Amino acid sequence: MGDERMKKRNGFTLIELLAVIIVLAIIALIAMPIIFNVIENAKIKAMENSTYGVIDAVRMQYMEELLNDEDGTLTLEGDVDELTLSGEHPNGGTWEIVNAADVTTGRGIKVTDVTFASMAGYKCNNDLTTGKVTCAK
């Protein structure tokens, strides 16, 4: 009679359920840092793209002033509201034209310590040799 009750068992024991929960917790502990790293890298790439947008906007404003027969001096005085930007607007940093001959490629425009509200503590800079923008803490 005792053997019949053991054969009709349809559920899981508490130990089996705890084992599954422990395995899932271990998988979650391994996966969480990877997921957070992917999210952080995506935000950094978005900041870099927004910085490229600042460079393009400065380039376009500079070219527009040249076409309007102005002296080629672009003075923004830290205010980006004059620029038509794609992406997030920066809330700090400097951008200057250091080589007018390379403005058309964007490599004549130096950006230094550009910051964005979405990623506090990060600053973006560009390398005039390669034209690449990097953002870091």
Question: Where are the language model's segments positioned?
Answer:
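Periplasmic/extracellular, small/polar-rich flexible segments of pilin-like filament-forming proteins
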Residues: 60-137
